[in-house]
Amino acid sequence: MFCVQNLPRSSALPLQSFKSHQRRPPCSVNTLGVMSNVNLHRSMAVKAISGPTSSAETSDANVEEEKSETYSTNMTEAMGAVLTYRHELGINYNFIRPDLIVGSCLQTPEDVDKLRSIGVKTIFCLQQNSDLEYFGVDINGIREYAKTYDDIQHLRAEIRDFDAFDLRVRLPAVVSKLYKAINRNGGVTYVHCTAGLGRAPAVTLAYMFWVQGYKLIEAHNLLQSKRSCFPKLDAIKSAAADILTGLRKKVVTLTWKNPDCTTLEISGLDIGWGQRIPLQFDEEQGLWILRRELAEGCYEYKYIVDGEWTINENELVTSANKDGHVNNFVQVFDDNPDSFNANLRKRLTGDDPDLSMDERLKIRQFLESIPDEEQ
């Protein structure tokens, strides 16, 4: 029998805990899901490939296509929407506002020139080193080239790919850095992750919601009218509530009664779909057990039993996404559902959240107070 327990012990982390939180790099990729194509971009900047190609060039192109297909497959399953990224086509982007662009990653130093030509003053990269290495992007070469100009700045603020909880926890520090860069550099800001379909849209939405005065749904509708993408809105909502109420945690215990299996792991929760945590077998109880501190919020997860991904049908299960995938999930609540903080979090994590003038001012002041990260 598998059960979920919310134990009474809890902890509250001060707002300062957001200062420079860094997460581990991801492990390989998730292996569930099916890839499908979607019309992503209404306006694109595409590399032109012309003339005869050698067998080596053809082989390299095939490798790039295979990497893109693998990445798209994993993005589709992790984001819960059918998404495609073609790295071999070059950088692509969309203006969301006259001063804000969301796009895919820079691939060569020449991409810096492309962005300078459209008025970009800040290039804001959300990729981790592992993301760059996967597609063979020379980030150091790009950054060094950008430094040869005095009218554009390249900044990095890493968020782990395919990880909604890392996005939630990192958003305050990342948006703080973006906010300060925009105030300092002016002009047009180019926000990108790898494909420009998850992390970059989410950071841009958080900035529009927290700083520019948009309601979240209004900002999201504007974004979708310019660029088809799938930002994790729940992470943005929870991050806003975390700033205003503090990041409170509770211990959650997951148990599974299956003494016949050899290994039992869990993926999702607060570690993302690219990583796994092993459950420990308690011989006395005959149970596989995992105890983990989780912040308030909703967490999806799956089990890997002797290498096979599965859910427990006796526990809470999400609705099927477009590809038919379902996950288990657990909701972590405040011990006092009638408290001011609980009601504030409930409002901010609802379907159509908005911030009062006072709440938005507090968030801006908090963003300004976060020490600058390197890079």
UniProtKB/Swiss-Prot annotation:
EC number: 3.1.3.-
GO MF annotation terms: carbohydrate phosphatase activity; phosphoprotein phosphatase activity; starch binding
Entry keywords, A to Z: Amyloplast, Carbohydrate metabolism, Hydrolase, Nucleus, Plastid, Protein phosphatase, Transit peptide
Region described as Polysaccharide binding: spans on this chain: 254-330
UniProt binding sites for substrate: 194-199
Transit peptide (first-last residue): 1-42
Polar residues compositional bias, start-end: 51-61
Keyword Aminoacyl-tRNA synthetase: no
Entry-linked PROSITE patterns: TYR_PHOSPHATASE_2 (PS50056), TYR_PHOSPHATASE_DUAL (PS50054)
Location of region: Disordered: 49-71
Tissue: Expressed in phloem parenchyma of 16-24 week old seedlings and 2 year old trees (at protein level). Expressed in leaves of 16-24 week old seedlings and 2 year old trees.
Any GO CC annotation of this UniProt entry: nucleus
UniProt GO BP: starch catabolic process
Domain spans labelled Tyrosine-protein phosphatase: 92-249
Active site: 193
InterPro entries listed in its UniProt record: AMPK1_CBM (IPR032640), DSP_laforin-like (IPR045204), Dual-sp_phosphatase_cat-dom (IPR000340), Ig-like_fold (IPR013783), Ig_E-set (IPR014756), Prot-tyrosine_phosphatase-like (IPR029021), Starch-Glucan_Phosphatase (IPR052832), Tyr_Pase_dom (IPR000387)
Pfam family for this entry, one: AMPK1_CBM
Main location class: plastid
Hydrolase as UniProt keyword: yes
Induction: By cold stress for at least 9 days at 4 degrees Celsius.
Domain notes for this protein: Contains a C-terminal polysaccharide-binding domain which interacts with the phosphatase domain; this interaction is required for glucan phosphatase activity.
Role description: Starch granule-associated phosphoglucan phosphatase involved in the control of starch accumulation. Acts as a major regulator of the initial steps of starch degradation at the granule surface. Functions during the day by dephosphorylating the night-accumulated phospho-oligosaccharides. Can release phosphate from both the C6 and the C3 positions.
Protein name: Phosphoglucan phosphatase DSP4, amyloplastic
